[in-house]
Every structure is written in structure tokens, then in C-alpha cells.
A protein has these predicted regions:
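Solvent-exposed, polar/charged alpha-helical surfaces in well-ordered, non-transmembrane soluble domains
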Residues: 45, 319-326, 330, 434, ...
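Sec-exported extracytoplasmic/periplasmic mature domains
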Residues: 326-337, 441-442, 446, 482, ...
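Extended catalytic-interface subdomain
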Residues: 376, 381, 387-395, 433-444, ...
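Conserved catalytic/binding loops enriched for acidic/polar residues
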Residues: 453-859
């Protein structure tokens, strides 16, 4: 017991000093009390430090937008296994000279990403060359077609399997691959191209949005333009779109059907050469019910084509635009698809908060408030397959003046409804519907078909029943406008004056491009069926595709702005109508107290329409008709030279017009009233004469003679008949005769090499005629889609056209002696006539004889 008490007391004694010490310490050192030790906070990673405070959004990868307007991508491993489309679009601009709001500044292109421990690399994959995955040459192919690196982005940090990179500069600076400025080679000049240097102090990334399939980045870029350092500011929207893991099955192109396409090369050990082929551009339409589709039933597509119509369109035109979009349903129905294309209004924020007309996911019909009289319909593709990913129609405000002028000069003599400065809405809707449908045709893959209208006869175009069914052309993708062949009284008989809603060729082309081929598993397996569809229509000229020609028209059967297969009669009938308009338009367009500016402009439209008809006859001189033939077919000619009879007819037609057009188109009293410069009307006559001596045309006449084809002109016969037609004029000379003969002597002196002075005259004339052609062709709705311009070269996009720049020239040893001989013939004609005619004629003959004698002596 005592032992237990002792032990307890000792335990207390041992404890008390401890508590006391603590108490003393607390008492004496209370002012210096230390806080209990805590664990030091963990230092933030560089990843977290960089993105702190940034707005985060999730898309194909994570995107951060910092308070300093920086953009950062956090990319998981999965992002490096996919491919994307990168686009650059003008969302707003301070100057519409080069591009308008809503327009792509560059063609979207394929990209992918790779990484190492230092950088993330932005590649532009090679798409122009292909190889089969199991071909033994694949290792060599990959080494020789390595995907180039467009940009490298240093890795900021890595976290949770994601690498962080800063891409701000790429979207804030003047990155050449997505620049809004057009980059031209030093040898090329274009007055519409804006040149300038980026002003980094006035350029910034303004907004970033992410969605499951895409990232949208807006930047404000400001340039100081040259040479005056004026500011040029744009809001650019760049899209990065995640592409399907498995590309759409491609379809092979055929020149007998006009579909936009991309060129490719195929490397294989199974072939003795590198094969070239083209894949067409089309939307990926797949039936909701494949079994029903294959039974021939109309089936809705899984994903229809949807166009959103700009909310700023005037209400009176909006329904017409939507109607024109959905007019193409009849073509898709021929391919087995119901409701394949849909027109919708721009949705409100309540209806679709994610809608953005500049987002690459949305295809839109956009309104551009500019003075340009045009419209265009580009589409943008996945270059791996040709699948159209998105498309736009850019509708320029002043397109109304374009269609107004067409209707007035082409049908004003026949249709009283168009004899006014402002059309009734009903009439304007007819024309707007055609233009809108034409542009939508481009967005679904169709190229211009310039040969379509050649399949109709004059009689067809004046037949009420025929025109009500077929309009003016089998394809609205032709530049065949209104029925200028129709004569007064034809409208009352029921003749249609406008193009069809959709042409029969257009329906055929959509069927060929979009109808699924039963049983085919590859593009190669589709070919027999596709060829059979073409063969079914081979003997019907309505289904012939006529390729556009560039830069010159040498095939008279594939022309722009023409109607019928008889350009001579069509021209005569339209010119007869133009004379009626010229005689009456000052009364029809009378606006009391107004200036004559509008009337002068409309006279310019008359000249443009007249020049179109002249231009339709010029290609017959030395002309060539082209055919798309295949081995094994009966017709083995890919080209046929225009016959002597047609060329002679063209020669006489042009000379007759050159002698007579001033009598009605350049009536002095009218020109003086409206202050119209007669210099341009004078150039019309010179253009006709120059066409008869054109070296390219002369060269093709010579080539035809060498070809052995029957019925062609011999060059000497052409020259003899031309000189007779120009210089052997009965009776007194008119002013037009003297002008024609003087120019003919100039041109022969120049092209024979006998006169340096005449060479200079011919060169100046060529420049003047180029300017005239450009001026009078401004209202031809270029669409920005002709001759390979549909897409930029980055994705290999193309359109089938005939290159006509390198026509064979007649050798100098042939042409020079021939022209010298003809000049001597002219001398003889003048000597025989110098004592005849009136005083003006005799003076003219004396002058020309003196001129020719000096020319001969000098040489």
C-alpha cells in the first residue's frame, strides 16, 4: 500500500515540473509566441500558372483564352491521331475591294498535329499523292511524301497527358497560310489586291469558342496599306474543324459530266506507271433507309444539305431565295433522295444559341452590301475524299442591276413589263430565282456547262410548248440568260423568255454524282455503272457537257452568253430587237428632270449585248469543235475544224456588221444627248476586222489545212476571199469601208513584219481591244468560279476546262509571203479604182497607194 502511494507521488512529481516549465515559458515569453508549424503549400505547375484565370472551353481539345487575350491549346494524345480542316474567313472588313464579309480569304486546307518533347508541330498533310496501305512501296512513299511542317509551337508544360501550347501569334499576326491579303507573284499585278504591312499594335485575338467538332477563333487584324499607310482593318474568323475518322468514299471524275474535282496521283507496284485520276466534289448523302433506297424508293438522307438565308435579305426577295435553294430537290430526287436540300432562315439566339454564319459548320446564303454586281457560290471540301464540308453563296447587293440590265436588253423588245427603270417585284423574282439557283448549283458541285444551249435550235426557242418545258437551255449552269431570240409577239403566244427552273442536264449531272451504285464497294467498282449512265444519254445533245475555254474562245459550240446552235440567225434576231430598244429606250426610261447618266449607262448595256453577238461569231474564224471521245467509240475525232462554208459565212457576217452597226448603235444625235464617247463604239468595228486577221485564228486555219480533214479552208483561199470581201467594194466607199480597209492594211503590214510602225499600231489596238472586251464583259456574272478558280491550289482543286493559250501559229515563212502577196493585190485594186469614185475615195486611194509604195521600197 505504502509502496503504491510512493510510486504515485513520484509520478506526479515527475510530471509537475513539465507543466510548470510550460507555464513559465508561456508567462515570460507570451509576446513572442510562435504559431504552430503548418505544411508549406504545394507550388503550382507551370501549366496551372499559365492558365490561371483563363476561360476554358472544350472541343476537339481543350482551349484556354486568357485575360491577356492569349490562346492556349491543351492537347491530349487523341488529338494527334486525327486530321482537321483549317479555314480563314472575313467576318467584317473596312474595305470590300478585295473581299466582303462572309467570304473565305483562303481555301480551307487539311492539317494535323504531331509532337515531341519540345514542340507541337502543325503539318499540312500531302493529299496529292496516294498509295495502297499494303503496297510494299509504302515505306519509300512515306519518306518521299513526308507531311511538311507549317508551324512549330513550343510546349509550355504537360499535365494529365495533355501538352499545353501557346498559339496566339499564329492567329494574331499575318500568318501567310491564313492571311486575308492576296499573295501574288511579283510578275502579276491586280488593281483589286490590297498590299500592306500588319500593324501589331492594332491587332488582337478577340474571341474563342469551342464546340465538340470545332474551334472558332476571332481576331482583329489591322494593316497599313501601301503606298499611303491608310488603315485596313478586318475581323477574321478562323475555324479548326475535326474531320471524320473515316473519309467518305470518293467518286472518280469524268470529263463528260461537269463536276468540280481534285487531281490525285496513285503509286502502285501493280501498274507500269504513276496513274493520275480526279475525285469529284460532292456532299455525303446517305439514305436513312438503305433497303428502301435500293428498291428505288425516294428516301431522306441521314444528313441533308442545309442552307441558312441571311436575315438581312429584304422580305420581298427572301422567299425567292429559299425557293431557288429548294428547287434543286427535283435533281436530288432523280438521284433517289427526298428533301435532300433545305432552306432555313438564320435562327435567333433563342432558337439556336450556337449559330454563327461564319462558323464552318454552317452553310449560308449571305448578303454583301457592296456596289459589285455579282454573286458567287464556292464550296469547301475534305481533300481526302472530295466531300463538301460547307458552302456559301455570296450575294452582292448590286446583283439586282445585273439582272435588270440583262432582262432589259435581251427581252425589252418583246416584253413590255421590263421597259422601265424599276421592275415590278414579280419580274425581278423570276430573274433572281435563276441567279440564286445557278449559284447553289456551284455549291453542290456543278461546274459551268458552256455548251448546253448549243443543243437547242432557233425553232425550239420560239416554240411555246418547248420553251415552257425546257426554257432557254438544258442547264442553268450555262451562261444562257434570257430568250433574246424571241421576237415581238412571241410572249403573247406563250414563249418562255427565261431559263428553266432546273435544266435536264443539271438533273442528269446530280444523278450521276450522287446516286449510290448498288453493290459497289470502291470507286473503281462504280466506274462501269457511271459509264453506263453517261452512255444512256450520249446521243441526246441536251446532256452534253461543254467545257469552259481559257483564255480565248476557239470552239464556237461552247460559248458564254449564247443561245441556239445557229449563232448567225440568233445574232441577227437579237440585233433586230436591239434596234427596237435603241429607238425607244429614251421614251421607255424617261424620268423628267433627271440627268442622262442612267440612259447613257443603258446604252452601254446595248453595246455589251451587241458585242456578245459579235463575239459569238468570231470563234468560227479558225475555229475548232472539241469532243470528249473514248477508245472503242465510232467517232475517233477529238477535234474537228470548222468548215470553210461556216468560216466564209462568219467572215461576211462580221464585215457586214462592221459596215452597218454605227447606223443604229452610234446615232450621233443620241450620243450627243447622253454625252456618250464614240471612241468605244468605233472600237467595236475595229474588233471585228482584227478578228479576221488574228494570228491565232490564221494559225488554226493553216493547221486545219495540214490536218487532212475534209471541207476546211486552205490558207491562201481564206486570204484571197478576205481581201476580196474587204477591198472589192461596189460603188463609193463609206466611212466604215475606209476605216476597215485602212485597218486591214495596218494589220497585214504588221503581221508580215514589213512595218515597225504598223506593229506598234497593232499592239496598241490589241491593248485597246482587251480593255474593250473587259469593259463590255463586266456584266457576265463571273461567279469567281471559272477555269480552275473554284478553289485555291492548296487542295489540288480543279475544274475541267480547255486551255486555248497555246494555239499553233502559222510559220513566218508561210504567213509573211502570203500577206505580202495580199498587199500587192490591194495595190492593184487601188490602181484600178483610183480614177473612179467620188473625191473622198480618190484621195483615199492616192494616200493608200503612196503608203504601200513606201512600204515596198523600205523593204
Amino acid at each position: 500500500m505504502n509502496k503504491r502511494i510512493f510510486t504515485a507521488c513520484m509520478a506526479v512529481a515527475c510530471i509537475l515540473p513539465v507543466f510548470k516549465a510550460e507555464a513559465q515559458s508561456d508567462y515570460f515569453f507570451r509576446s513572442k509566441k510562435k504559431k504552430p508549424a503548418t505544411e508549406a503549400p504545394a507550388q503550382k505547375s507551370k501549366f496551372d500558372q499559365t492558365v490561371t484565370g483563363a476561360k476554358k472551353s472544350e472541343g476537339p481539345f481543350t482551349v484556354y483564352f486568357t485575360k491577356k487575350n492569349e490562346i492556349l491549346f491543351a492537347m491530349p494524345d487523341s488529338a494527334f491521331r486525327r486530321e482537321y480542316l483549317l479555314s480563314s474567313r472575313v467576318a467584317a472588313t473596312s474595305n470590300t475591294r478585295e473581299a466582303v464579309a462572309g467570304q473565305m480569304s483562303t481555301s480551307p486546307f487539311l492539317i494535323k498535329f504531331s509532337r515531341d518533347s519540345i514542340n507541337v508541330y502543325l503539318h499540312t498533310p500531302q493529299v496529292g499523292a496516294m498509295v495502297r496501305e499494303d503496297d510494299p512501296i509504302v515505306p519509300s512513299f512515306k519518306k518521299n511524301f513526308f507531311d511538311p511542317v507549317l508551324k512549330a509551337f513550343p510546349i509550355v508544360d504537360t499535365k494529365d497527358g495533355k501538352v499545353l501550347i501557346d498559339v496566339t501569334k499564329f492567329f494574331r499576326e499575318d500568318e501567310k497560310s491564313i492571311t486575308p491579303l492576296t499573295i501574288l507573284p511579283p510578275t502579276m499585278q491586280n488593281a483589286n489586291v490590297i498590299k500592306g504591312m500588319l500593324d501589331p499594335t492594332a491587332s488582337i485575338v478577340t474571341e474563342v469558342k469551342s464546340f465538340p467538332r470545332n474551334v472558332e477563333i476571332k481576331s482583329m487584324l489591322t494593316y497599313k496599306t501601301q503606298p499611303y499607310s491608310e488603315p485596313y482593318t478586318l475581323i477574321m474568323q478562323r475555324s479548326i474543324l475535326l474531320l471524320p475518322e473515316k473519309p467518305m468514299r470518293m467518286r472518280l471524275q469524268d470529263n463528260r459530266v461537269g463536276i468540280f474535282n481534285s487531281s490525285r496521283q496513285y503509286f502502285s507496284t501493280d501498274k507500269d506507271k504513276v496513274e493520275s485520276f480526279k475525285l469529284i466534289h460532292r456532299w455525303d448523302l446517305q439514305p436513312k433507309d438503305s433497303a428502301a433506297y435500293m428498291r428505288g424508293e425516294l428516301v431522306e438522307p441521314v444528313k441533308p444539305i442545309v442552307f441558312y438565308v441571311d436575315s438581312v435579305f429584304p422580305d420581298k426577295w427572301r422567299a425567292t431565295i429559299k425557293q431557288a435553294i429548294e428547287d434543286w430537290r427535283m435533281a436530288f430526287e432523280a438521284a433517289g433522295f427526298k428533301n435532300a436540300i433545305i432552306a432555313k432562315d438564320y435562327p435567333t439566339k433563342e432558337e439556336n444559341p450556337d449559330f454563327d454564319p461564319d462558323d464552318i459548320r454552317f452553310s449560308c446564303f449571305k448578303y454583301a452590301t457592296t456596289t459589285t454586281a455579282n454573286a458567287m457560290g464556292p464550296s469547301f471540301v475534305d481533300p481526302r475524299s472530295g466531300e463538301i464540308i460547307c458552302a456559301d453563296v455570296i450575294w452582292y447587293h448590286n446583283v439586282l442591276s445585273l439582272v435588270h440590265n440583262w432582262r432589259f436588253v435581251q427581252t425589252g423588245a418583246v416584253d413590255p413589263r421590263v421597259r422601265k427603270a424599276v421592275f415590278d417585284d414579280e419580274v425581278m423574282r423570276e430573274s433572281l430565282r435563276y441567279v440564286a439557283a445557278h449559284e447553289i448549283g456551284h455549291t453542290i458541285g456543278l461546274m459551268h456547262n458552256m455548251g448546253a444551249s448549243y443543243s437547242f435550235t432557233i425553232e425550239n426557242l420560239r416554240d411555246p410548248q418547248f420553251t415552257q418545258k425546257y426554257g432557254t437551255t438544258p442547264s442553268i449552269m450555262d451562261y444562257a440568260r434570257n430568250n433574246f431570240v424571241a421576237q415581238p409577239g412571241d410572249l403573247e403566244r406563250g414563249v418562255r423568255l427565261t431559263p428553266p427552273i432546273i435544266g435536264v442536264y443539271d438533273i442528269h449531272a446530280i444523278n450521276w454524282a450522287y446516286r449510290l451504285v448498288p453493290g459497289a464497294k470502291t470507286a473503281e467498282e462504280e466506274k462501269p455503272t457511271l459509264n453506263a449512265w453517261i452512255a444512256e444519254k450520249k446521243d441526246d445533245p441536251m446532256f452534253t457537257f461543254g467545257a469552259q475555254q481559257f483564255p480565248y474562245t476557239i470552239d464556237p459550240t461552247d460559248q458564254t452568253e449564247d443561245l441556239s446552235n445557229d449563232h448567225f440567225r440568233a445574232g441577227d434576231m437579237s440585233i433586230s430587237n436591239l434596234k427596237i430598244i435603241a429607238k425607244n429606250m429614251d421614251k421607255w426610261l424617261l424620268e423628267k428632270e433627271a440627268r442622262y447618266d442612267d440612259l447613257r449607262d443603258m446604252h452601254g448595256q446595248l453595246m455589251s449585248q451587241y458585242y456578245r453577238h459579235v463575239s459569238h461569231i468570231m470563234p468560227y474564224i479558225g475555229g475548232v469543235e472539241h469532243f470528249e471521245i473514248r477508245q472503242g467509240e465510232e467517232n475517233t475525232l477529238s477535234r474537228r475544224f470548222i468548215t470553210k462554208d461556216k468560216q466564209r459565212k462568219a467572215m461576211n457576217w462580221l464585215l457586214n456588221q462592221a459596215r452597218t452597226y454605227r447606223q443604229w448603235l452610234a446615232e450621233p444625235a443620241f450620243l450627243n444627248k447622253v454625252e456618250q464617247n464614240s471612241g468605244m463604239t468605233d472600237l467595236l468595228g475595229k474588233a471585228m476586222v482584227a478578228a479576221l486577221f488574228n494570228p491565232g485564228s490564221i494559225g488554226r486555219i493553216y493547221e486545219a489545212e495540214q490536218s487532212g480533214q475534209p471541207g476546211v479552208y486552205k490558207l491562201t483561199d481564206y486570204a484571197n476571199e478576205l481581201i476580196d470581201a474587204i477591198f472589192n467594194v461596189k460603188g463609193n466607199l463609206t466611212d466604215a469601208d475606209r476605216s476597215i480597209q485602212n485597218l486591214a492594211i495596218d494589220l497585214m503590214s504588221a503581221y508580215s513584219g514589213l512595218s515597225t510602225e504598223s506593229k506598234n499600231t497593232a499592239r496598241r489596238l490589241s491593248e485597246e481591244l482587251d480593255a474593250l472586251s473587259h469593259k463590255l464583259s463586266e456584266d457576265n456574272l463571273p461567279c469567281a468560279l471559272g477555269c480552275g478558280d473554284h478553289h485555291a491550289a492548296e487542295d489540288g482543286a480543279d475544274s475541267f476546262f480547255r486551255l486555248t493559250a497555246f494555239s499553233k501559229q502559222a510559220p513566218n515563212e508561210v504567213i509573211a509571203p502570203l500577206l505580202l502577196q495580199q498587199l500587192k493585190r490591194v495595190q492593184t485594186i487601188y490602181r484600178n479604182r483610183k480614177a473612179t469614185g467620188n473625191a473622198a475615195d480618190r484621195s483615199f486611194y492616192d494616200y493608200q497607194l503612196l503608203r504601200l509604195e513606201r512600204l515596198m521600197k523600205t523593204n
